[in-house]
A protein has these predicted regions:
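Conserved S-adenosyl-L-methionine
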Residues: 1-108, 127-128, 134
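C-terminal catalytic and target-recognition region of SAM-dependent MTase-like enzymes
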Residues: 103-198
Length: 198
C-alpha cells in the first residue's frame, strides 16, 4: 500500500524480526522473492538442467543496482535487533538497512532535503507479547513522537478500532487487511493537502 521506490527512505521503529524493512528493500531494489533460496523442485527430473540457474540470472539482471534506497529499523528489544540484522543478511539487503536498538519514544527521523520518508510499522497488538494497556500506551506514544511533516508519510497496521483516538489523529485513509487471522486496518497518514503519498 505504501509506494516504496528505489529512492525511498523507509523507517520501522518497532521492527521485530525486520519483515517490513526487508520486504521494502526487496521491492525497492526489484529483487525477486526467493532468488537466494534453493527449492526442492530443483532436483526433479522433469526440469531441464540449468533452468533454475537461468531464471536466477534473468532475475539478477533486473535488480536495481542504481537505487539509493535505505531503511532504518529499530526496536527496544536487543533480540529483535539481532534478528533483523540476521534476516537482512540472509535476504541479501543488510547493506541497505541500518538497525539499532532504540525506544519508540526516541524516534526522530533525519530526512535529507528533497527526499521523502515512509514509516511503515506494525506495533504490538496487546494479544501475545504485551498487555492491551501496554500496547495502547505505545500507540499513544507514537501519536506524540511521530512528527507531522510534509516529507514523511505513516502506514500503521493495527487491529484496534479505536486506534485513531489513541494515536490522537484521524487517518487520511484506512484500508482493511488481515494479518494472519487477525482483522486489521492500515491507518495512512500523509500530506492530505496535496493528496500525496510519501
Amino acid at each position: 500500500l505504501a509506494r516504496v521506490r528505489g529512492d525511498s527512505l523507509v523507517y520501522d521503529p518497532m521492527c521485530g524480526s525486520g519483515t517490513i524493512v526487508i520486504e521494502a528493500a526487496l521491492k525497492a531494489l526489484n529483487i525477486a522473492p526467493g532468488i537466494r533460496r534453493r527449492f526442492a523442485a530443483q532436483s526433479w527430473k522433469c526440469f531441464q538442467n540449468g533452468v533454475f540457474d537461468e531464471v536466477r540470472r534473468e532475475a539478477s539482471a533486473q535488480v536495481r543496482r542504481d537505487a539509493v534506497f535505505e531503511a532504518f529499523a529499530s526496536d527496544i528489544d536487543p533480540e529483535a535487533v539481532r534478528l533483523t540484522r540476521e534476516n537482512a543478511a540472509k535476504a541479501g539487503v543488510a547493506g541497505r538497512i541500518h538497525v539499532r536498538q532504540a525506544d519508540i519514544k526516541d524516534f526522530a527521523p533525519e530526512i535529507p532535503e528533497g527526499r521523502k520518508g515512509i514509516l511503515i510499522t506494525n506495533p504490538p497488538y496487546g494479544e501475545r507479547l504485551l498487555a492491551a494497556s501496554e500496547a495502547e500506551e505505545i500507540c499513544r506514544t507514537m501519536g506524540q513522537v511521530f512528527p507531522q511533516r510534509d516529507d514523511l508519510g505513516y502506514y500503521i497496521i493495527s487491529p484496534h478500532d479505536d486506534f485513531e483516538g489513541v494515536f490522537g489523529r484521524e487517518a487520511v485513509r484506512r484500508r482493511k487487511l488481515y494479518n494472519g487471522m487477525i482483522k486489521c486496518q492500515v491507518y495512512m497518514y500523509f500530506n492530505s493537502r496535496r493528496g500525496e503519498k510519501a
